Amino acid sequence: MSEAIRLTQLSHGGGCGCKIAPAVLAEMLKTLPQAQLFPDLLVGHETADDAAVYRLNDEQAIVATTDFFMPIVDDPFDFGRIAATNAISDIYAMGGKPILALAIVGMPVNTLPIAAIQKIMEGGASVCAVAGIPLAGGHTIDAPEPIYGLVALGLVHPQRVKKNSAARAGDVLVLGKPLGVGILGSTMKAGKLDAEAYRQLIDTTTQLNTVGTALGALDAVHALTDVTGFGLLGHLLEICRGSGLSARIEAGRLPLLPAAVEFAKQGIGPGAIGRNLASFGDAVAFDAAVPEWQRRVMADAQTSGGLLAAVAPDSVDEVLALFHAQGFAAACVVGELQAGEPRVGVVA
């Protein structure tokens, strides 16, 4: 089925590479009203956090998010799995536990066979089952390009919400998954991805960030986000701006998908890399020793990427142990946060 119709050829973009560039999005959002009139809204759009959080009572807050995009892979079932995993990740990124999902489905019904659409939806439902939540309904439209995703809802204790704006100077940055998803997606779209590279792509993008719920219970985890369409640098900048801090990243410590390295050195990657780098402007400074391909990897649009945690230095081992125990073998320290103007410096 996926060989007859390549999903990635039906859309102009794929995965979180479809996101509007950070600078453009900021311009679009700047006229929206602030949330001061809603004291129970614990997290709104002000710091570009991963999900909205609304306090229900002293013990519970609801976490609400939506995420959808066009295909990053050709296989319909895998596309559904990736999109669902990516959407649910925003619940974990707030330290929450998912409880419910609704499907968002836009499909070119005159182009794409019903059987393929069914596989996409089945893929999403399979991930909800793994997460232990119902896929309780949703909404469908006839669209010119395939679009799939979820509305995801979760619960978190109001005092355990992990905002991207609560990091502290001296915090150590821990990244949970390797980078390179967008690069492999672009390679696949070009017909150059072998079976092993595809396995790496699917394994990382369908791994639920379940460790976020456990991280939410740790006082030493001060801030949390997931790395998606704006790349590592873009989402780290959101932490810096929200928390009023600067960051230092060591490029040589970054975990990378092995199959993505050579393609990155060839300059392969989604158009979102260039858009992201342009949006960062002088808020990101690279040491001269950092090669161009590594700079691009750090701006690569990740789909269903890893959690990025700002952790008190004396609890780093505990946090890494949590990641590793839940199957995030690549999790490692990649940098630190410091007092200073909101910016990111990258050294070799």
Residue ranges and their predicted role:
Residues 1-348:
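Helix-biased detector of long, well-ordered alpha-helical tracts
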